[in-house]
A protein has these predicted regions:
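Transmembrane beta-barrel strands of outer-membrane/channel proteins
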Residues: 36-44, 79-87, 125-133, 176-182, ...
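Short glycine/proline- and aromatic-enriched beta-strand/turn motifs that initiate or cap beta-hairpins
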Residues: 22-78, 86-88, 257-259
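Cleavable N-terminal export/targeting peptides
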Residues: 1-33, 260
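Outer-membrane beta-barrel transmembrane domain signature
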Residues: 136-225, 236, 260
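Repeated loop/turn-to-beta-strand initiation elements of outer-membrane beta-barrel proteins
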Residues: 72-78, 115, 168-174, 224-230
């Protein structure tokens, strides 16, 4: 009887220690993709700037991205350059040439992990600095004339960024990313007579001006230092202090990552 009891206790001890052996042995430094990233995408873009027109203009717009990410000892940073331009943004028979440029620096810190199913989700959080600039050229045709009024604006922002990474296995990651401004200095083309006492640029909160970037991606590691990802990206930019401006896009992206 005593021998049988000892066997039962031994088996229970093995069962109770199995979760410890099955625990995720990954770390934040191992799961966060680093190196150089080059992206290309296409998506639907819509814009309205009431300095020129209250109508919405929309169409397909390409997306180009170049970034570099470094992460060691639970902290790091990302440098990112994004560019978009299209001459096919329109409203009925009126076309608009649209251009967007942004430069971002994200500071990244490990922010813990939590279990989802049999794996852990790894969280990253930190402050961000971003500069965003846009231009719109409207092509208004009139008898005997071809008028091209322009409008432009910018946002220089302090904000936050957050990453969630869910490693499904050694080859495949699910990843989510969000960046949002909190406090900004912003300016745009305005009617000087109408806004004589409220000139540009101005310091504003996220209530009056927004710049939000969000994407979900699946990353597949082709080799130890090379990965390929496909992603959905949502982008929103808004300046509401003067004649309102708002632009949004939904894009599909493909990215090549090379770890240095």
């Amino acid at each position: 009887m005593k021998k049988k009891t000892n066997i039962i206790i031994f088996l229970l001890a093995i069962i109770l220690t199995l979760p410890a052996f099955a625990q995720d042995t990954l770390s934040h430094e191992k799961v966060l993709p680093t190196g150089i990233f080059v992206s290309y995408g296409q998506g639907w873009y819509a814009v309205k700037d009431q300095y020129i027109s209250k109508e919405q203009y929309s169409g397909m717009m390409p997306y180009y991205n170049l970034e570099w990410l470094r992460f060691r000892n639970k902290k790091g940073y990302r440098l990112q350059f994004e560019y978009r331009k299209s001459t096919d943004i329109s409203n009925h028979n009126i076309t608009t040439d649209a251009q967007q440029v942004s430069f971002s620096q994200d500071f990244i810190f490990a922010a813990g992990d939590f279990p989802v199913g049999s794996k852990n989700v790894y969280a990253f959080l930190g402050p961000s600095v971003q500069i965003f600039y846009y231009e719109l050229y409207y092509n208004f045709a009139q008898p005997g004339n071809y008028i091209t009024p322009t409008t432009l604006g910018f946002l220089g922002s302090l904000g936050i960024n957050a990453n969630l990474i869910y490693p499904l296995n050694k080859k495949l990651n699910l990843e989510g990313f969000l960046r949002s401004n909190v406090l900004s200095i912003t300016g745009k083309k305005i009617d000087d007579e109408r806004y004589r006492d409220d000139q540009t640029p101005a310091f504003v909160s996220v209530i009056s001006a927004s710049k939000i970037d969000f994407h979900l991606s699946v990353r597949y590691f082709l080799a130890k230092n090379v990965a390929l990802s496909v992603a959905y990206k949502f982008d929103l930019s808004r300046i509401n202090k003067w004649d309102p401006y708002i632009a949004a896009s939904n894009s599909a992206l493909i990215t090549v990552q090379v770890k240095l």
